């Protein structure tokens, strides 16, 4: 994924790299009526977003940056490792159609939460594992879920569980990247319930 950084894509934003209190506030954007938000960080946000797009009851996904110190970062800023942002997928879901627990189960299945600041060949703090909650019930379920998952693996789970902070939507070409075809125009299905393997490519 860092190839975009090398090509200079996503670098049009002019970011003030000084720490900003704006970046530290709780995400107060409102989901659609009857829906809830949650945020997940599990490595490259392209493949994580596609996984959640396929979940019945998920009504919207967006990729972006959160948990950092600067206001309105660009992809290039985040890749520099100096802003402390994580690559995030913000998931909007209808709790009548999709349980939060099912979203957590998918989270654990789609990445290795025992590798610190790394998923596969993607290395950096922006690729860290994280669950970012919007209410006490989400926090409770997330922590219980982590405890259960820890019992299933030999190495220490390094996933952080924190309140969801301000969400900075990523540049448009990152949104639904794999379903739009990615770099090579190879579109991948977003059909609800689809189990096709997800191929993440720049």
From Swiss-Prot:
**Cellular component terms per the entry's GO annotation:** cytosol
User: Where do the TM regions start and end?
Assistant: none
> What are its E.C. numbers?
1.8.4.11
Q: Which GO terms describe its molecular function?
A: L-methionine:thioredoxin-disulfide S-oxidoreductase activity; peptide-methionine (S)-S-oxide reductase activity
- Which Pfam family is one of this chain's hits? PMSR
Superkingdom: Eukaryota
Q: Which reaction does it catalyse?
A: L-methionyl-[protein] + [thioredoxin]-disulfide + H2O = L-methionyl-(S)-S-oxide-[protein] + [thioredoxin]-dithiol; [thioredoxin]-disulfide + L-methionine + H2O = L-methionine (S)-S-oxide + [thioredoxin]-dithiol
Q: Which UniProt keywords apply?
A: Cytoplasm, Oxidoreductase, Phosphoprotein
- Asked if the keyword tRNA processing belongs to this entry, the reply reads no
Give the protein's biological function: Catalyzes the reduction of methionine sulfoxide (MetSO) to methionine in proteins. Plays a protective role against oxidative stress by restoring activity to proteins that have been inactivated by methionine oxidation. MSRA family specifically reduces the MetSO S-enantiomer.
> HAMAP family recorded for this chain?
MsrA (MF_01401)
Protein name, entry field:
Peptide methionine sulfoxide reductase A1
**Species, as recorded:** Arabidopsis thaliana
Which gene name does the record give? MSRA1
């Amino acid at each position: 994924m860092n190839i975009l950084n090398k090509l200079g894509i996503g670098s049009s934003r002019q970011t003030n790299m000084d720490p900003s209190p704006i970046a530290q506030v709780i995400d107060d954007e409102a989901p659609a009526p009857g829906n809830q938000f949650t945020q997940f960080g599990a490595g490259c946000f392209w493949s994580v977003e596609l996984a959640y797009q396929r979940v019945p009851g998920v009504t919207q996904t967006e990729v972006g940056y959160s948990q950092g110190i600067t206001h309105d970062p660009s992809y290039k800023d985040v890749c520099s490792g100096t802003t402390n942002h994580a690559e995030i997928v913000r998931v909007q879901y209808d709790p009548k159609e999709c349980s939060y627990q099912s979203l957590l189960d998918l989270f654990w299945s789609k990445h290795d939460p025992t590798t610190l600041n790394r998923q596969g060949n993607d290395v950096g703090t922006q690729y860290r594992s994280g669950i970012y909650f919007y209410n006490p019930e989400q926090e409770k379920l997330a922590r219980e879920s982590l405890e259960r998952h820890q019992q299933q693996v030999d190495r220490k789970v390094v996933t952080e569980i924190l309140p969801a902070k301000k969400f900075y939507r990523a540049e448009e070409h990152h949104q639904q990247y794999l379903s739009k075809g990615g770099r090579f125009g190879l579109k991948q299905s977003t059909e609800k319930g689809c189990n096709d393997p997800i191929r993440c490519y720049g």
